[in-house]
Amino acid sequence: MARRKNHSIKIENNEKENQILVSLSIVALLGGCSEEQVQRDVYQSLDDCLADWKKIELCEADKNTESTQKTATTQQQGLGLNIRDNGNAESAVKNPAENNAQANQSENRAESTTKAESTDPSLGAAIAGGVIGYMAARAISSFLGPSYHPGNRAVTTPTGQVVQPQTNRSVGKPMLVKGNAGSMNSKPVSRGGFSSPNKTHRSSGG
């Protein structure tokens, strides 16, 4: 009787250990799904990124490079302003009559420009803002493409459109990103296994 009890206790312990192992495996798998590893292409310019992904909302400026360039540009602009101010001060002392004539001409030009833009100022401001934004983006020397799964260089937009580049103008190796995959503008196309796309089967009519 004692042997039978010991045998049954061992079986129960083995079953509990197996249940614990199975539950740990499930937790590990779920953790792997939530902490997906994706990658992003690195580009030297906005034009290169657009050549691959076709949509400007899929290209993002590298924040590290952008902050560094802004600091350098601000310093250069400060030096340039000091030089121009000194030059203007010297010319004002030398040629006061010429400066007055130039000032009158610039005022007339400003008035004519204001009259021309007064018909639709909002449109002019929108166009100017868009052009300035695009030119500022082109001045940045490092851009990142959207996040995608290794081995499947494709993303989906919020409207459901799948974008898969046919070219690759990125430089170096893609940047690996861990954690929450995707952004507001795109999501990586599923590799299969965790979520499968809906498939429609068409029946052939006889």
UniProtKB/Swiss-Prot annotation:
Domain of life: Bacteria
Compositional bias (Polar residues): 66-79, 182-198
Composition bias type Low complexity, residue spans: 97-107, 155-167
Region ranges (Disordered): 64-123, 155-206
Biased composition (Basic and acidic residues): 108-118
Protein name: Uncharacterized protein HI_0930
Species per Swiss-Prot/TrEMBL record: Haemophilus influenzae (strain ATCC 51907 / DSM 11121 / KW20 / Rd)
